[in-house]
Amino acid sequence: VTAVDGVDLTVREGEVFGVLGRSGAGKSTLLRCVNLLERPDSGRVLIDGSDLLALRGAGLRRARQGIGMIHQHFGLLGSRTVAGNVAFPLEVMGVPRAERAARVAELLDLVGLTEHARAYPAQISGGQKQRVGIARALAGRPKVLLSDEATSALDPETTASILELLRDLNRRLGLTVLLITHEMDVVKRICDSAAVMHAGRFTESGPVTELLARPGSELARGLFPLPPAEPRAGSTVVEVTFVGGATEEPFVSALARKYSVDVNILGGAVETIAGERVGRLQLELPGEPSVNAAQLAFLREAGLSVDVRTSDPAEPLTAEEDAR
């Protein structure tokens, strides 16, 4: 069985990159290939220009120290305190006691657990346990943090706080974060770039704002789920995605005035994602798609992504296809 097949992934330094997919898509295997917990059959794993597949022994161990990892299941040692769990990797690395104590105190302050340093895992909440896991993963001052479904076992409020912490660490430390998730909301909240994975392959990838503006994007439909609307006889249903400055333009009223048509708004949403204002609208225009070619071209020329809904919602037509 091939778990990951022909995947090319580039994560820019200092960004948060999310890999989104259902269970069994190959996400966890991909993540384990990054730090060579799974060794790929072919290809390269480059971090800071070094190919991990070419390293052995001490060289590989040093490279792995630059990669932290957190998991869905926290993996804390029940016999150790919070501080003791964070100190454990430092002990393994042979860090002197005084330096170790200072680093543990720094990390606990970073994740907001200073007051719980002497508590045991059984005495703290799930969200606090994940904070311990994050502090432990950062003990060796890694440049890269891998997150394997780190929030999937948490309630929504705690999930939001952990995602906020990860974004804060990304910005304060210049940390590069590669996370996998099956939750669209995780991508919406903190990811700069993302990829959608099915059956071991990427079906789309790139900066989130670019994916949202791409006609037919699965990610755009997932982040902004609009109610299903099949075209009525003699009408055209259009899904319009707009990013950045386009969110401030009155394109609906401009369309109605220019072509003297009644435009019906069936649904919509506007949010801030990856620092950009992004929105989607579902519009209904009178007439079949062939009649609305000029109107669709008008929307596209305004810098909008346009999907024309067919009777099969899984097979939208783009504005370009409709114009042909």
Predicted regions and their residues:
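Short coil-to-helix segment of the ABC ATPase nucleotide-binding domain corresponding to the Q-loop/switch region
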Residues: 80-88
